[in-house]
From Swiss-Prot:
The keyword Transferase is annotated on this UniProt entry: no
A GO biological process held by the record: primary miRNA processing
Name by which UniProt lists this protein: Serrate RNA effector molecule homolog
Its job: Acts as a mediator between the cap-binding complex (CBC) and the primary microRNAs (miRNAs) processing machinery during cell proliferation. Contributes to the stability and delivery of capped primary miRNA transcripts to the primary miRNA processing complex containing DGCR8 and DROSHA, thereby playing a role in RNA-mediated gene silencing (RNAi) by miRNAs. Binds capped RNAs (m7GpppG-capped RNA); however interaction is probably mediated via its interaction with NCBP1/CBP80 component of the CBC complex. Involved in cell cycle progression at S phase.
Phosphotyrosine modification, residue list: 8
Gene this chain is encoded by: SRRT
Subunit structure: Interacts with CASP8AP2, ERBB4, NCBP1/CBP80 and DROSHA. Interacts with LUZP4. Interacts with NCBP2/CBP20 and NCBP3. Interacts with MTREX.
Amino acid sequence: MGDSDDEYDRRRRDKFRRERSDYDRSRERDERRRGDDWNDREWDRGRERRSRGEYRDYDRNRRERFSPPRHELSPPQKRMRRDWDEHSSDPYHSGYEMPYAGGGGGPAYGPPQPWGHPDVHIVQHPVLPIQARLGSIAEIDLGVPPPVMKTFKEFLLSLDDAVDETEAVKRYNDYKLDFRRQQMQDFFLAHKDEEWFRSKYHPDEVGKRRQEARGALQNRLRVFLSLMESGWFDNLLLDIDKADAIVKMLDAAVIKMEGGTENDLRILEQEEEEEQAGKPGEPNKKEESRVGPGLGDGERKANEKDDKKEDGKQAENESSSDDKIKKSEGDGDKEEKKEDSEKEAKKSSKKRNRKHSGDDSFDEGSVSESESESESGQAEEEKEEADETLKEKEKPKEEEREKPKDAPGLECKPRPLHKTCSLFMRNIAPNISRAEIISLCKRYPGFMRVALSEPQPERRFFRRGWVTFDRSVNIKEICWNLQNIRLRECELSPGVNRDLTRRVRNINGITQHKQIVRNDIKLAAKLVHTLDDRTQLWAPEPGTPALPASLPSQNPILKNITDYLIEEVSAEEEELLGSSGGAPPEEPPKEGNPAEINVERDEKLIKVLDKLLLYLRIVHSLDYYNTCEYPNEDEMPNRCGIIHVRGPMPPNRISHGEVLEWQKTFEEKLTPLLSVRESLSEEEAQKMGRKDPEQEVEKFVTSNTQELGKDKWLCPLSGKKFKGPEFVRKHIFNKHAEKIEEVKKEVAFFNNFLTDAKRPALPEIKPAQPPGPAQILPPGLTPGLPYPHQTPQGLMPYGQPRPPILGYGAGAVRPAVPTGGPPYPHAPYGAGRGNYDAFRGQGGYPGKPRNRMVRGDPRAIVEYRDLDAPDDVDFF
């Protein structure tokens, strides 16, 4: 009786199980099956005959191994594929069709290949967020990739042979212009409803934004002038050894910006006294931790403990002052105070238990699933405690209001307005508005403001966000409550934002040299003048008459600035001394050996420069020595966070060439900040498709004038019928004037976007150029791309393979394949069941026969090279 199908399948499975468990028998069967493969058989037999000791003759550095050889970064080896199901050199039998094979698989939609062939890479989508790049690519809807501009060579293929070269170039330029115009219009339609885009270009939103920015600038200017009048800048120098004084000045500026008074500035003195009253070794430790670029866990915890101690001291001072006030109120208040203290003790014990379990997870800004499950049962308790905290925090506010009435003679305690707590949200979708985040976070006590970064084109225009709270709140509890909240199907996933570690950072000490300082004064004054003009900061208010253009700027720090830009030389004295037989003039330095000079420091010039730099930093949020502008700093958690200053004096003498090189490089870095914001000229705007408001209104009226029949016309906006088109037109202008205004605003909206020379756009996609025949690259690198560690993952364009990690690729040059077939066929998807060829160097050249059961040869390949022969790249 014949076996059933089930029995046959079971036996087949048993056969493969035996092959996997009994490796020697499978190898012998494979040798019998491949009788013609003499090389493999001989190598395997030799391997059986040799003992472990004999292997040491080939490579004495080889480590003794008693387990099967592990290939690093490779999966466990499975059953090897046989001749009948493997076509490594035949593209027509591949298991998965590559882009060039004409199949349905597009370049960006292949299945994930974590251990695939070195030639088969997952094509990186240029606008994927980090979660999509770290997860499976099959789970993400990549959308339709944008069209790629044709190269001139590709464009010529679409032209008739009769077209001459001049006409072809002209047509190609027209094609490029049309392509860019279409790309821009598509981008406008795709993003015009998003808040970040409307706030930049919509006429209604632009006016509000400018007004807010002007108000913030004027507030910063008032703070700067107030600090200057109070003498904060008199003895302040922007040198790294004055870091503590610089931080104190920045904190004073922040307190003033937050609406603080002179009384609130006293808290800076109290902090200094507390630091000095602490252990004598503590300040040195804190300075060391500030200087280090990254803190270890132990150091971070120590700093947190110090901060907690300082907060505890402040709380004790507050409670002692409250006791003095409450003693005068009577015995009844004492009983209430006892009850309050008991409640606080209970609450603090609960909070300590809860903080114990969650501290480590919150430090990293993420919570594990096990913790979320274990703490999910405490949700009701947390709500009750949150209500208690709200009530208890409202009580002190009421008491503070009553204090001035009861005890007008007592002074208010200074507030630490320069310190905040904040949350960081890495991925905020472009369709989420700022108002939605504000309404979500307003529910928690101590909320102050929200800051959103500029959208990132390479990350699907996702933005980063910072939510700032008062220093008194429990930021980790708020972070926990916001963990699993979704806005418009987007998880906010907040994390606690740590305080800045090094607020004062230094650059090269060569900047102390007199010649460089004078050049910096010139550049800084130019920057101040440019930014003041751009923001109209010193311009008169709209109601007041304008000043004549000949009058100088009203900015007080630019007064008499030219006196310091002119270098004084004693040319007459030198001439007289030289002609009267004095010392001969010094020979000019030779070009080959430039003369070295000492760093010369001029305190007077440095004082003038520092006032300019502080004006730029506080008023315009521009860090001069870092050559960058900090955008939206008023909305960030730290309103004056980081500043770069001059480093220590260089120990060695400097050459004149070094000074000139520094000045040249620094001016190049400042050029983008000095350039006025560019906008397209009228001619360029017309070429790019600038719209005329009157023409667009005519188009709108025409499209809403429909003829139903003879002497019967319809206005679809209202559904009314008229005898002629002129009546419909009159009706639209009279009854639908708001629609006409909307059309005009839409035109202005588009034109504002078009005329911005720095308008956002998708990253430009350039097809990769295949390398020349003699171009050799290191193994594993794709030509036309930088090294893997130099390129962000999200910036890979469509249709271009991802560069593999060094050491993964085969030894031969693997050109990128933008279009058309490769010079040799790729291996099929998943060939080799783990693809060990790449690790043992078996993929050296196309069509090379594979040794199927070879695990790896410890011996180096012996090769013969004729030194007299011409260069050849085909050595093994």
